[in-house]
Amino acid sequence: MTQIVVGENEHIESALRRFKREVSKAGIFQDMRKHRHFETPIEKSKRKKLALHKQSKRRFRT
């Protein structure tokens, strides 16, 4: 769980910015998206295969 301690003279906007930065560092949003819907093993393998294909295309192009 990500926690931010807001200072006494700190603006809420800067605290919110720090919180967003910590959440993105921790990878919480990616994990949330990954677990949003149940994914069957076949769907998971298809997604991984497609990601490998895209990655190899990028490597080949450069």
From Swiss-Prot:
Q: Which GO CC terms are listed, alphabetically?
A: ribonucleoprotein complex; ribosome
Pfam families, alphabetized: Ribosomal_S21 (PF01165)
Q: List the disulfide bonds.
A: none
Q: Which residue intervals are annotated with compositional bias (Basic residues) in the record?
A: 45-62
Keyword Ribonucleoprotein annotated: yes
User: Any idea which UniProt keywords this protein has?
Assistant: Ribonucleoprotein, Ribosomal protein
* GO annotation terms (biological process): translation
GO-annotated molecular function: structural constituent of ribosome
Q: Entry's InterPro entries?
A: Ribosomal_bS21 (IPR001911), Ribosomal_bS21_CS (IPR018278), Ribosomal_bS21_sf (IPR038380)
Q: Where is this region: Disordered?
A: 43-62
* Homology family: Belongs to the bacterial ribosomal protein bS21 family.
Database matches in PANTHER family: MITOCHONDRIAL 28S RIBOSOMAL PROTEIN S21, SMALL RIBOSOMAL SUBUNIT PROTEIN BS21M
Protein name listed in UniProt: Small ribosomal subunit protein bS21
- Which species is listed as the source? Anabaena variabilis
